[in-house]
Amino acid sequence: MSTMTPREIVHELDQHIVGQQDAKKAVAIALRNRWRRMQLDAKLRTEITPKNILMIGPTGVGKTEIARRLAKLTNAPFIKVEATKFTEVGYVGRDVESIIRDLVDSSIKMMREQEMTKVRHRAEEAAEERILNALLPPARGEDGAVEDSSTRQIFRKKLREGQLDDKEIEIDVSATPVGVEIMAPPGMEDMTSQLQNMFSSMNTGKTKKTKLTVKKAFKKLTDEEAAKLVNEEELKAQAIDAAEQNGIVFIDEIDKVAKREGNSGADVSREGVQRDLLPLIEGCTVSTKHGMIKTDHILFITSGAFHVSKPSDLIPELQGRLPIRVELQALTPDDFERILTEPTASLTEQHQSLLATEGTQIEFTADGIRKIAEIAYQVNKSTENIGARRLHTVLEKLLEEISFAAGESDNNVTIDAAFVDGQLGELTKNEDLSRFIL
């Protein structure tokens, strides 16, 4: 679990997302409260439940990006899903309980990676011995014990220095289970995975001789040895506990399952999904192939644009289970300008690096960047507001000719206001054209 303070979390999010301080603060506090809760005694800890969040804001302002960046910071089981993927229980499609099953799978994967990192050094030593045995069968003393001869030591030194990387050896490796693809109706993924596990376990313990280069063999054998050193039962127990106590679920597009005013008829993927989400968010027990999972302390962060529906269109019970509401602001020309320059690996930096691989150097001037920002804002205003994603469209159109001719000759291009006007001026003046091209 992350031990970062709210200020540190916001600072980290600032490296990638411009503005939206309210949303950043809300998720930072929610994340820190997970750590604070774990410092309490067990009796009080069970009483404190997470305060779930609803993020509201137009498309392209950073809701999903906050989730993506948060996933990298948390060091806790994290899963991002779209509400539109699920249907009411009893209908064809995935039911919402599969969210928790996926969270547990994600937790097990995360824990396995952590445990394998811990035993990596021992696994590498064991893999080294197996490779040396293949290169140079060990000499045995009179008592039958393996002796580390001077020749073996020379080979060990060469192996560590990478001098034997390209040499081919024949080794025994675990046989890869035959992939059994089972087609099952939507919503029965749990049964499918159990059947696949049953078939794959039939091959457990079998080995086969394979020819590999020393470099590839070392990686494969290290992974194999690390897997042997990890206690699977203990790992699963830790993973289930981590998912229950520190798990975070981010549900995007929650507005798409809100029932719109004046819209009657059977809303299979709407109100039913909301009702199914209620017990999950409130706290219930979900059956998975790894055991029973309690959702009482899982943090749910939901987000939606709500440009057709309103947060009040969600059923009242669901609104009550999302007590913290954060509104994200629409982007201004100043925000667009900052998005183009401030974040780590900004859009301008990405395009410069891509074209530099072919010897084309492009330089963005301050007035050029301002002009791009103003055009993106103007097109959003006059057509459809898609937020920061508009910058991708504008930049691609702006650099189309340069990108097409890159590599034909080494040249330097300065992107200033005049250049931007020359490339995009006509498009922005003609609303019909910008509607289709930008």
UniProtKB/Swiss-Prot annotation:
Annotated residues for binding of ATP: 18, 60-65, 252, 317, 389
Keywords tagged on the record: ATP-binding, Chaperone, Cytoplasm, Nucleotide-binding, Stress response
GO molecular function term, any single one: ATP binding
InterPro entries: AAA+_ATPase, ATP-dep_Clp_protease_ClpX, ATPase_AAA_core, Clp_ATPase_C, HslU, P-loop_NTPase
SUPFAM superfamilies attached to this UniProt entry: P-loop containing nucleoside triphosphate hydrolases
Subunit architecture: A double ring-shaped homohexamer of HslV is capped on each side by a ring-shaped HslU homohexamer. The assembly of the HslU/HslV complex is dependent on binding of ATP.
Gene source species: Saccharophagus degradans (strain 2-40 / ATCC 43961 / DSM 17024)
Top-level taxonomic group: Bacteria
CDD domains cross-referenced by the UniProt entry: RecA-like_HslU
Subcellular location: Cytoplasm
Main location: cytoplasm
Pfam families membership: AAA (PF00004), AAA_2 (PF07724)
Function text: ATPase subunit of a proteasome-like degradation complex; this subunit has chaperone activity. The binding of ATP and its subsequent hydrolysis by HslU are essential for unfolding of protein substrates subsequently hydrolyzed by HslV. HslU recognizes the N-terminal part of its protein substrates and unfolds these before they are guided to HslV for hydrolysis.
GO BP of this protein: protein unfolding; proteolysis involved in protein catabolic process
Gene3D superfamilies: 1.10.8.60, DNA helicase RuvA subunit, C-terminal domain, P-loop containing nucleotide triphosphate hydrolases
Protein name: ATP-dependent protease ATPase subunit HslU
Gene Ontology CC terms, in alphabetical order: HslUV protease complex
Family: Belongs to the ClpX chaperone family. HslU subfamily.
